[in-house]
Regions:
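Conserved S-adenosyl-L-methionine
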Residues: 2
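Conserved SAM-binding loop of SAM-dependent methyltransferases across substrates and taxa
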Residues: 5-18
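Active-site capping/gating segments
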Residues: 102-139
Length: 139
């Protein structure tokens, strides 16, 4: 969700060619970026959906077993609630937190939806721009 240039979707498709990758981006120009980049890197078959994820009908899509939230536009908790409604029972949500505020919002969304937060992974090449990779499941 929030595919931007498509880098995470493309890498997922390259690493797991059998994977059905469905990506969402609010900005309409994201579709062209995704198409260009998926061709450039040899990762065909990614379904790119543009528009506001919170208002997107998800019924045409298979239940996801993994969801990566890359962009949330300040609506992270609402996104988590919507994802929980369609997430496969054994599925997970992954989020890269780059600020204390986004970490807190993810934790609140997970707690409010009765999900389980797993231990996170911290990545930092230096003291600038640390990333916390967070994961949650239904149980």
């Amino acid at each position: 969700i929030g595919f931007c240039t498509g880098s995470v979707s493309i890498e997922a498709r390259l690493q797991f060619p059998h994977l059905a990758v469905i990506s969402f981006e609010i900005r309409p120009e994201g579709k062209e970026l995704m198409d260009t980049n998926s061709r450039r890197f040899g990762a065909p078959g990614i379904t790119a959906v543009t528009g506001d994820f919170l208002y997107t009908d998800l019924t045409p899509f298979a239940r996801p077993d993994a969801v990566f939230i890359g962009g949330h536009g300040g609506h992270l908790e609402e996104m988590i609630e919507k994802v929980k409604q369609v997430l496969h029972p054994e599925g997970c949500i992954v989020f890269n937190s780059v600020s204390a505020e986004s970490k807190e919002a993810f934790c609140r969304g997970i707690e409010r939806n009765g999900m389980v937060l797993h231990p996170s992974t911290h990545i930092a090449l230096n003291e600038y721009n640390p990333i916390e990779i967070m994961k949650a499941t239904l149980s």
